[in-house]
UniProtKB/Swiss-Prot annotation:
Cellular localization per UniProt: Nucleus, Nucleolus
Protein family according to the UniProt entry: Belongs to the RRP36 family.
Major localization class: nucleus
Organism, scientific name: Chaetomium globosum (strain ATCC 6205 / CBS 148.51 / DSM 1962 / NBRC 6347 / NRRL 1970)
Bias-annotated ranges (Low complexity): 103-120
InterPro entries listed in its UniProt record: RRP36
The protein's name in its UniProt record: rRNA biogenesis protein RRP36
Pfam families referenced in this protein's UniProt entry, alphabetically: RRP36
Source taxon at top rank: Eukaryota
Amino acid sequence: MSSVKRKMPPSSLLQRRVKPRYEPEPESDIEEDVSEGPSEDDVGLSGSEGEEGGELSEDESGSGSDEDNSDAASSSEEEDDEEEQEDDGPPIDASQLSFGALAKAQAAMRSSSSKSQKASDAAKTKEDEGYGHPTKLSSAKKLDKRSNKHAPVELTSKKPVSRKRDFLTSTAETKRPQARDPRFTPLGPGASTAAAGGGSGSTIDEIKARKAYAFLDDYRASEMQELRATIKKTKDAAQREKLQRALLSMESRKKAQDRKDRERAVIEEHRKKEKELVKQGKTPFYLKKSEQKKRVLVDQFQGMKKRQVDKAIERRRKKVAGKEKKMLPMTRRGAEER
């Protein structure tokens, strides 16, 4: 009885794992190894030849199939050996390399260094775009601990200056109220709301400032007396006229302040009377602006003589007539004067 060997398909022969045999490393150059080693086309051809041999073995005897199997096994072993030689190649000697290979290596190193430089530049630009604000890494740095809990905290003075200038925006520093001289700005911080017609904060501030700086009236009176004395002594006409204008300005400011004080006194007196009436159960009565002016005029004329009252009325009549003439057109102004 003849022993029949089992045939294996050629595809399984190519995929079968074969243990590589140990061979000493060749002492030739890399170029010789590449030239001696079979290319991928050769491997493909050998595989195709193995397939053709497998087809022929079906018609031929069993001895032919054994030879094909041995050829396929040897080709797979050679392929594995070549892969190992490619992975674990011998160390390259720089003296044996050509100038072209060295130039390519230098170009590759330059390109890698330029890429790293570009990455660092991009990181710097991102930091600059942050307008100098500290990042998470910089804020994470902790300062040294204090030697004592009562010791002052040490802060670094090397803080980056922001590129953003917010002088046009409203910040906390611009909103912070600044100290002002009440002689020149008596209305205080609520002047804007009072000018718009809503809010009595400005009047309250003005009353407080007036009471707190009432002693300035004595200083102004003494200054006016000194000005009158210097006007009498000066002989230069230009200097004398300049001093007279200054004295007239101070007198007009004093008259305006006295008028405001009288108006405020009239309103305060009316409020006191109304508070007493409200306590008795009556409804409060609020004065209109026109009624306030009438009461102020009555109070002003009460302390004057008849001649002074006539002068004040004549002055007021001329003032009102001048305002009315300004409102008329030029043609009618001439007719009115005639």
